[in-house]
Regions:
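Glycine-rich phosphate/pyrophosphate-binding loop shared by adenosine-nucleotide-utilizing enzymes
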Residues: 22, 71-76, 88, 231-242, ...
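Conserved GNAT acetyl-CoA-binding A-motif
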Residues: 88, 109, 115-133, 281-293
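Conserved acetyl-CoA-binding loop-helix of GNAT-fold acetyltransferases
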Residues: 95-97, 101-116, 264-277
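Active-site rim helix/loop that mediates acceptor-substrate recognition in acyltransferases
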Residues: 33, 39-78, 185-236
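Short amphipathic alpha-helix that is part of the acyltransferase structural core
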Residues: 17-51, 146-152, 159-210
C-alpha cells in the first residue's frame, strides 16, 4: 500500500539533512520574493504559481514546502489534500538550475508526502501529473489517466478574426451550473465519461465531486461548465467540458478539458469554450485544450481555422500522464 511505501528515515520535516546541508520547511508569505526568483523563466510565462502563491498561503488543505541549501532556495513543491481528504496531489514542483541533478527535489517531494500523511491520517494515495510515460517510471506507479493538450496564443480582441466558420448548430452546447454538474454529470454519468474516476482541471487531477469543484473555485478566477443541449425529456448527456480561467505570470490562461467519445461533440465543445474564452478575455491570452489523444488532429485543425494559422507550429502539443501510488 501507499502508506507502507513511506520510509521512516525520510521524515525530515523541519530539520537539517546533514548529508546535503539542506533545510526543509513549510513556506511562509514572506518567502514570496525568493520564490519569484526561483521561478524566473519557468514555462516561458505560462507559470501559475507566482500569481496564486498568496491565495495558496490562505487556503486550507494546501501546503508549500521549500528546500534551502544554506540560505539559498534550492527547490519547491506544493501539495493539495483533496477527494474528501483521501488523496495528496503534489504540484508546482521546481528546482533551481544550480541544484539540478542532486536528488534534492526527490527528497523534498518525499518530505511533503510524509508531512501530509502525518497531518492527514486518512490519506490513502498520492497522485501526480507528469510528462513521463509509464515505461519511464517503476511499477509502483499506476497510470490512471492520460491526455494530450494543445496550447496556443490568442490575440487581443481588436486583432482577432471577425467570425468563426464552423457550423455546428445541430450540436448545440450550453452552459450548465455547478449543481447540475455535481448532481447529474458526476453522479449519473461518471462511469461513462470518466472511466478512470479522475478529471483534469487545468491539469490538476481530481475525483469528480462537489468538494473538489469548490476547491477549484478557491484558487481560480472562474470555471465554465458545458454539456450538449438535450432535445427530449430523459436525455442523458454524452459529453462534458470544463473551462478554467486563471492568471499566469504573463497571460490570462483558459484551459478546457473535454470528455466525450464523439468527434462532433468534441469539436462542438471546443468551439463553445473557445468562443466563451474570447467573450470573457479582451487581452491576449493563452488557450489550452486537453482531451483524449484520438482528438488531437481534429483539435489542431479547429484551432488553425480559428486563429488563421498557416502552420501548426504555433500550436504546442504536450502529453500529461496521471499516476497514483
Amino acid at each position: 500500500l501507499f502508506r507502507n511505501s513511506v520510509e521512516p528515515e525520510v521524515l525530515i520535516f523541519f530539520r537539517q539533512t546533514m548529508a546535503q546541508n539542506l533545510t526543509i520547511r513549510l513556506a511562509r508569505s514572506t518567502d514570496y520574493d525568493q520564490i519569484l526568483k526561483l521561478s524566473e523563466g519557468i514555462y516561458d510565462g505560462h507559470d501559475y504559481l507566482p500569481p496564486r502563491y498568496h491565495t495558496w498561503m490562505a487556503m486550507e488543505n494546501l501546503h508549500v514546502m521549500l528546500a534551502f541549501s544554506g540560505n539559498k532556495l534550492a527547490s519547491l513543491v506544493a501539495c493539495s489534500i483533496i477527494d474528501e481528504g483521501k488523496t495528496v496531489v503534489t504540484r508546482a514542483g521546481r528546482t533551481s538550475p544550480e541544484f539540478c541533478g542532486q536528488g534534492i527535489f526527490k527528497l523534498l517531494q518525499q518530505a511533503i508526502v510524509d508531512f501530509s500523511l502525518k497531518r492527514y491520517p486518512i490519506i490513502q494515495q498520492w497522485r501526480l501529473v507528469t510528462v513521463f510515460s509509464p515505461e519511464m517510471l517503476d511499477n509502483s506507479y499506476e497510470n490512471v489517466d492520460e491526455q494530450d493538450s494543445l496550447t496556443c496564443m490568442v490575440l487581443s480582441s481588436t486583432k482577432r478574426p471577425p467570425s468563426f466558420s464552423f457550423n455546428l448548430d445541430s450540436l448545440e452546447i450550453q452552459p450548465c451550473t455547478k449543481e447540475y454538474v455535481c448532481d447529474v454529470i458526476f453522479q449519473k454519468e461518471e462511469e461513462k465519461l470518466f472511466p478512470g474516476k479522475v478529471i483534469q482541471a487545468d491539469r490538476f487531477p481530481i475525483e469528480p465531486s462537489l468538494s473538489n469543484i469548490n476547491y477549484l473555485m478557491q484558487e481560480n478566477d472562474s470555471l465554465h461548465f458545458a454539456v450538449e443541449k438535450c432535445v427530449h425529456d430523459g436525455c442523458r448527456p454524452r459529453s462534458f467540458s470544463l473551462g478554467v480561467r486563471s492568471q499566469y505570470v504573463k497571460f490570462v490562461n483558459w484551459c478546457v478539458t473535454i470528455y466525450s467519445d464523439d468527434p462532433q461533440l468534441y469539436q462542438a465543445h471546443l468551439v463553445h469554450q473557445f468562443k466563451r474564452s474570447c467573450e470573457e478575455i479582451e487581452s491576449e491570452f493563452s488557450f489550452v485544450c486537453c482531451h483524449d489523444k484520438k482528438f488531437t488532429k481534429n483539435g489542431i485543425e479547429v484551432l488553425q481555422e480559428f486563429l488563421s494559422l498557416k502552420s501548426d507550429e504555433d500550436i504546442k502539443l504536450r502529453k500529461a500522464y496521471v499516476y497514483e501510488q
